[in-house]
């Protein structure tokens, strides 16, 4: 949390249920802009968004963009992000790489990027997702901001691979 608040990158290796989500949720509420949370599962994104909305009077505080949304729902998300209501925007790596989303995010003040389930980056990991390998080049295209990578499962080899790729 301290690293993010001071504009530095962070790597978090913490057991399931240990509070990894809080490591990016708390700074997102304090910092200017919107935090981009890269997450591999639609169900996980929905749960996180629902949990954040339950704690806020502002329903636009958290959103996700993925293939399950209609055009009008995506427009609503974008309006909330542009108006400054949204502090957390969850995206799958596949959505992050879409040109229309890259162009949109280039016009947004991003506080930081959170890479949840970061072990998916590593070829050495059990849940390797090739799209995760493209996160750093996409961030370079969208705009620089601190990165926090979070995982519960990473051998030293996987940890090194994550840090090297981000």
Give residue spans per PLM region:
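Conserved Walker A/P-loop ATP-binding site and its immediately adjacent core
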Residues: 22, 33-55, 67-69, 73, ...
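Post-DEXD/H (motif II) to motif III coupling segment of the RecA-like Helicase ATP-binding lobe
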Residues: 106-166
């Amino acid at each position: 949390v301290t690293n993010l608040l001071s504009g530095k990158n962070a790597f978090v290796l913490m057991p399931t249920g240990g509070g990894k989500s809080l490591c990016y949720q708390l700074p997102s509420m304090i910092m200017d802009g919107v935090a981009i949370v890269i997450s591999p599962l639609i169900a996980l994104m929905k749960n996180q968004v629902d949990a954040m909305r339950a704690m806020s009077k502002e329903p636009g505080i958290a959103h996700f963009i993925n293939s399950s949304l209609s055009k009008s729902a995506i427009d609503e998300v974008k309006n909330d992000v542009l108006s400054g209501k949204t502090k957390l925007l969850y995206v799958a790596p596949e959505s992050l790489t879409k040109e229309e989303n890259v162009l949109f995010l280039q016009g947004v003040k991003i506080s930081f990027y959170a890479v949840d389930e970061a072990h998916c980056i590593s070829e050495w990991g059990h849940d390797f997702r090739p799209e995760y390998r493209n996160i750093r080049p996409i961030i370079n295209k969208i705009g620089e901001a601190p990165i926090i990578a979070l995982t519960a499962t990473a051998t030293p080899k996987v940890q090194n691979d994550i840090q090297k790729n981000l």
